[in-house]
Amino acid sequence: MIGKLTGTVTDLCQESLILDVGGVGYNVFTTRRLIDSLRTGQNLSLYIEHYFLENINKLYGFECRKSQEVARMLSKVKGINYKIALSLLNHLELGELILAIQNKDESRLKIKGIGEKLVKRIITETYEDFLKLDSHLSGIASSTNVHIASEAVSALVKLGFQHKPSHKVVMEIMTKRPAIEIAELITLALKML
């Protein structure tokens, strides 16, 4: 089984890329976000999930082990496959996805192809496992800080700011000042947005 591939990107497609490893081109499905950040000729390493089902043989690639682990956890939910897991990772940053499940935030998980029943099933079946994960890869460690960050982002979105820039600014502030109070966090974030 393939666990990791390192090679040169030769082609970029809508949902996948071709990774040349020693003269062999592997078609690897990954997030649109990653595809958009790459260019042909670039070297790349991806953690691989090799999916077999009857006559289907697909490779799914992830930039880091944590993304791979999250996709693996999601794929265990009835109705979720790696393609849908990639859609969720494309829609939400890794830390946001983990936070959404930890906070049982159903609205954040509703995307094309995932209805209300499936969102509830994702939360019900993965909640305990996701509680064991760190929600942000750099800086926010305690569950209190995770809650403060989530509340701050929600407040900024309710004030009319887009979620992605709000999340980025909040994480930037919290990485530098993990013990910040929520009111000060929102005030600083408003100044930066």
Swiss-Prot record:
Positions of the UniProt region annotated as Flexible linker: 149-150
Q: A GO CC term? A: cytoplasm
Record region (Domain II): 64-148
Q: Name one GO molecular function term.
A: four-way junction helicase activity
Q: Which domain of life is it from?
A: Bacteria
InterPro entries per record: DNA_helicase_Holl-junc_RuvA_I, NA-bd_OB-fold, RuvA, RuvA_2-like, RuvA_C, RuvA_C_sf
| Residues covered by region (Domain III) | 150-193
Major location category of this protein: cytoplasm
Query: Which keywords does UniProt give here?
Result: Cytoplasm, DNA damage, DNA recombination, DNA repair, DNA-binding
Q: Which GO terms describe its biological process?
A: DNA recombination; DNA repair
TM region positions: none
Question: Where are the annotated segments for Domain I?
Answer: 1-63
* Compartments (UniProt record): Cytoplasm
- HAMAP family cross-referenced by the UniProt entry: DNA_HJ_migration_RuvA
| Assembly notes | Homotetramer. Forms an RuvA(8)-RuvB(12)-Holliday junction (HJ) complex. HJ DNA is sandwiched between 2 RuvA tetramers; dsDNA enters through RuvA and exits via RuvB. An RuvB hexamer assembles on each DNA strand where it exits the tetramer. Each RuvB hexamer is contacted by two RuvA subunits (via domain III) on 2 adjacent RuvB subunits; this complex drives branch migration. In the full resolvosome a probable DNA-RuvA(4)-RuvB(12)-RuvC(2) complex forms which resolves the HJ.
Per the record, the domain comment is: Has three domains with a flexible linker between the domains II and III and assumes an 'L' shape. Domain III is highly mobile and contacts RuvB.
| Family membership | Belongs to the RuvA family.
Q: What does this protein do?
A: The RuvA-RuvB-RuvC complex processes Holliday junction (HJ) DNA during genetic recombination and DNA repair, while the RuvA-RuvB complex plays an important role in the rescue of blocked DNA replication forks via replication fork reversal (RFR). RuvA specifically binds to HJ cruciform DNA, conferring on it an open structure. The RuvB hexamer acts as an ATP-dependent pump, pulling dsDNA into and through the RuvAB complex. HJ branch migration allows RuvC to scan DNA until it finds its consensus sequence, where it cleaves and resolves the cruciform DNA.
The protein, known as? Holliday junction branch migration complex subunit RuvA
What broad taxonomic lineage does this protein's source fall under?
Bacteria, Pseudomonadati, Pseudomonadota, Alphaproteobacteria, Rickettsiales
